[in-house]
Amino acid sequence: MFQAPRESTLFLSGEKISGEDVRNQNVLATTAIANVVKSSLGPVGLDKMLVDDIGDVTVTNDGATILSLLDVEHPAGKVLVELAQQQDKEVGDGTTSVVIIAAELLRRANELVKNKIHPTTIITGYRLAIREAVKFMTDVLSCSVDSLGKESLINVAKTSMSSKIIGNDSDFFSTMAVDAMLSVKTSNSKGETRYPVKAVNILKAHGKSSRESVLVKGYALNCTIASQAMKTRVQNAKIAVLDMDLQKTKMALGVHVTIDDPDQLEKIREREVMITLERVKKILNAGANVILTTKGIDDLCLKSIIEAGAMAVRRCKKEDLRRIAKASGATLLSSLSNLEGEETFESSYLGSAEEVVQEKFSDDECILVKGTKAYSSASIVLRGPNEYSLDEMERSMHDSLSVVKRTLESGKVVPGGGAVETALSIYLENFATSLGSREQLAIAEFAQALLIIPRTLAVNAAKDSTELTAKLRAYHAASQNAEVTDVKKRGYKNYGLDLLNGVIRDNVKAGVLEPSMSKLKSLKSAVEACIAILRIDTSIKLDPERQPEDPHAGLH
């Protein structure tokens, strides 16, 4: 008699999913995303080939790149894609593992909800677990870079490269990455030492083998001088950085000038030329001997620049000029007009560098800005057989540079190869049993979820994951149960997987290291993303509005 109103009556156009269904859907979406990148984890991970709608091909191993090229429709899936991009932006590496951990945490949380554990309890448990994990990682697992020396920096870069296309030449490239980061060392206003990744410019040149790549001290611009009559080297450079056109100034469209004397027409033309020439003169009079601009330069202006013995480069990338301006202390100007509307150029706008020179790499020429005043910069010129491998090399290099930066700034590293995850897993299992509340179930599941990393690593290396993970757990359990005095057993905490030989080894001695900051960030981000999705219990999707049909549609 009293019928419960159907849910559909509330929404005229759309669907409402709630309770278990929405959780299952979310888990399904996140697992699908994690499965896409799962097989690319680790030193023997495989690459993915992505073809977009116009047919552009990308071959990559980088989790963030793979996910950003996918067109994900499900909102829960989008959360994971954003998570990978965030990790890429903040740390640069660990994008694949962060997605895998988040998806696994969510899957296990969903199983608990099915067993009648309230999501809030699970969330509290996860938060407790991450707090303990972070504490254990910083106190016990991480070791300082100073105690391991510069070698450890190279090892950190090698570990980051091991899964990438340049993994075979990791000795060569890791040294290059470390040297590049050390050469751009700078300190900010608070006196903290910083290593800006953006100060390292990466150029790609086709041809030769990847081992012929070079690290150049100075900022390399993929441009050439505007005229062959110019100098190709300027010492003690004073650099003007412009984002404006030095072509002849044409009158704006729609301007009508009525003249009754042909001489006046000639005067107008002369004036058009003179305006730009005056601009160039102002810049040269301020002491500039190198002019870099994003737009074109007129031939007449080039003549006066050549006569002044200066150097000009046109059509540079704006992003490059922004970085050069920052490094040399110049101001990037988009117009010479000051607040009064008069055109001026002051010498304070100029940046300074020891020299600006045009050099030749294989068949390509590029401009190098060396010895910039504000902070030094470095450039890496990558060589490779084709565009796909060069793009992938650039991504791998970026990851390695970011990892070296994080290691230098935080000064702490942890062993790689699944060592951290296994150690945390054992620690959290023991911690869970010490609790009496329901949260212990969530913490135990959290501990199990972390083992997905060593398992996936082993599976990708075509090794027996069950056996290797069990061995690894045994080592870490022995380490955590050992007496403080038993140094040998305590040292087992650094044991991780050696995936090439399928054995367990001390990864600190083997040089498989990762910045502890990367691990901390990825764990925290994974838990936050998982909790965000876990809190969702209803999803309401509205249908797109239907446009009323035009009755005159066929009559036009």
Curated annotation (Swiss-Prot):
Its main location: cytoplasm. The keyword Membrane does not apply. It is found in: Cytoplasm. One of its GO terms (biological process) is protein folding. Keywords: ATP-binding, Chaperone, Cytoplasm, Nucleotide-binding. Heterooligomeric complex of about 850 to 900 kDa that forms two stacked rings, 12 to 16 nm in diameter. PANTHER family: CHAPERONIN. Molecular chaperone; assists the folding of proteins upon ATP hydrolysis. Known to play a role, in vitro, in the folding of actin and tubulin. Belongs to the TCP-1 chaperonin family. This is T-complex protein 1 subunit alpha. It comes from Schizosaccharomyces pombe (strain 972 / ATCC 24843) (Fission yeast). The gene is cct1.
